[in-house]
């Protein structure tokens, strides 16, 4: 898992060196279509990456975005109106029927369908109109690391091309170097705080809340800890009562309006 996590910079660099014209073409398609809304289709870590993408689309493009509830298509056969909708699926494997079948449904109903997927030979890749590879390489660890990070980047690329935002594109281009530096950072100071913990609260707000959700999942998956993520906007409404002396908090304080 650690090896795959620290390789994220290389994976992101590989992704950014590929498919530039395809992303530009997708951006032109998105700008030429008047979508009234967008929907994300994903599960687990990929759903957290989808929440990050949803923040970007709503904040920058002004379109309402919802995460498709699990089993709505596969079990309940709900008659959703899909025309003039953008449907984006995110998946490492591209195998889950709960992701593949909704994308087929949306495409058949006239929606624009995009798959951000690591396995480009998967059923999901074959089902979507637009398939954008993550270029994360094979992931051995059950806990997703490099595929999660490359999913975030792919989502940001989609929005950067849709908005045709040069500043965002420049920020994305700088990511491999920034990630490489982060991988070299000394995180040992956190060990004394986290090692004895049995419960952890993870806090984020706005664009960082999906990352807080993923961090909490990682604590559960890898360390069998009771970790829960909360928005910084809601932490005073109940969660604060759980905090006592010595209770560990992990806070993602990203620059911008949410940091205050």
What residue ranges belong to the model's regions?
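An N-terminal, well-structured beta->alpha segment
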Residues: 1-36, 177-184
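Conserved phosphate/anionic-ligand binding catalytic regions in large, soluble enzymes, centered on
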Residues: 1, 7, 48-53, 212-214, ...
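Glycine-rich phosphate-binding loops that contact phosphosugars or nucleotide phosphates
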Residues: 33-177, 205, 240-260
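Acidic catalytic cores of enzymes that act on phosphate-bearing nucleotides/polynucleotides
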Residues: 62, 195-258
């Amino acid at each position: 898992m650690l090896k795959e996590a620290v390789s994220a910079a290389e994976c992101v660099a590989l992704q950014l060196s590929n498919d530039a014209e395809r992303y530009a073409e997708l951006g032109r398609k998105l700008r030429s279509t008047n979508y009234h809304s967008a929907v994300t289709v994903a599960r687990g870590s990929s759903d957290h990456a989808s929440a990050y993408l949803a923040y970007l689309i709503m904040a920058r493009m002004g379109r309402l975005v919802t995460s498709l509830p699990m089993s709505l298509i596969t079990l309940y056969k709900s008659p959703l109106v899909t025309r003039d909708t953008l449907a984006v699926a995110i998946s490492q494997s591209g195998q889950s029927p709960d992701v593949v079948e909704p994308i087929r449904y949306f495409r058949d109903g006239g929606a624009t369908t995009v798959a951000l997927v690591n396995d480009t030979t998967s059923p999901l890749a074959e089902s979507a109109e637009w398939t954008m590879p993550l270029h994360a390489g094979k992931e051995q660890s059950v806990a997703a690391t490099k595929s999660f990070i490359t999913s975030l980047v792919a989502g940001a690329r989609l929005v950067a091309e849709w908005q045709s935002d040069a500043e965002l594109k420049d920020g994305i281009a700088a990511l491999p170097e920034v990630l490489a530096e982060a991988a070299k950072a000394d995180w040992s100071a956190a060990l004394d705080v986290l090692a004895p913990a049995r419960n952890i609260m993870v806090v984020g707000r706005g664009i960082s809340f999906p990352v807080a959700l993923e961090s909490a999942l990682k604590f559960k998956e890898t360390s069998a800890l009771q970790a829960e993520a909360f928005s910084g906007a809601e932490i005073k409404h109940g969660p604060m009562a759980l905090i006592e002396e010595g209770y560990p908090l992990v806070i993602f304080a990203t620059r911008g309006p949410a940091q205050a």
